[in-house]
Amino acid sequence: KFIFIFIIGFNSLHAFQPSIEDTKNFLKPELNLVWQEEFSDPKLNTDKWAFQLGNGAEYGIAGWGNNELQFYTDSSDNFELSDGMLKIIPLYNKDSSKTFTSVKLVTKDLVNFTSPGVLEVKFKIPKGQGLWPAIWMMPEKNRFGGWPKSGEIDLMEARGSNTNEVLSTLHFFQNGHRLLGSEYKVSNENNFNQNFHIITLIWGIDKISFYIDNQFLVYEGSLTKLLGAKYPFNESFYLILNTAIGGDFVKAPKPNEICSLDNCDDSKKFIVDYIRYYQ
């Protein structure tokens, strides 16, 4: 395993490693499971999830602000609930006006998460150049201003062209854009496409930690000193599951590596087994 911690926009930052007490405080056995999604029903639970549709132009951010190519739909061509799992299906259809389609599910206005708590998600990523699966969170309210002032929590994002690596990142700051995160790399045999892994967000008051399969990734316990009263991560956030196609984060998509209507095995789908939140 290999972990690389990255910081963009800082002259200095302290306290990467959580203390033993910090970790114990969140992993106590008396934590209660307060929300879960096991995807065991054959239909999507619309009390928990909504579809965000379009290509971003509807929100004034065509390409979703990252030059992404997909159009998000609520079509059964782009997702399925089977084997007790959610499977997001990024799709290439050369005969459609919407060449690339996918699904983006959000809990916005339905379920919000607040600290302190522990959020864990069991997942597999799709394999294919240009695919960009993500598990992330955005603020319920932009209390401190528009992005990134009110924060963004990326539990997991990955590139379908490199199934040995995932990233966890925090986005924030009042003047410009700063981020703190880490890359986590595994062996070919343990890659994120063929094997399930669990990402855990340990979300405290004034501090955040990420773990993959109980392996420490990155700890943030010093941003309150930098941001003061405008520290955004003590607010309520909602959850997002999606797979983008193309964009600034990934290479240009190869259509032959992406699902088509008549050819799509599970290796090309973003699969989520469960989501659980403890407090």
Locate each region found by the language model.
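Sec-dependent N-terminal signal peptides
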Residues: 2-11
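GH16 jelly-roll
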Residues: 16-279
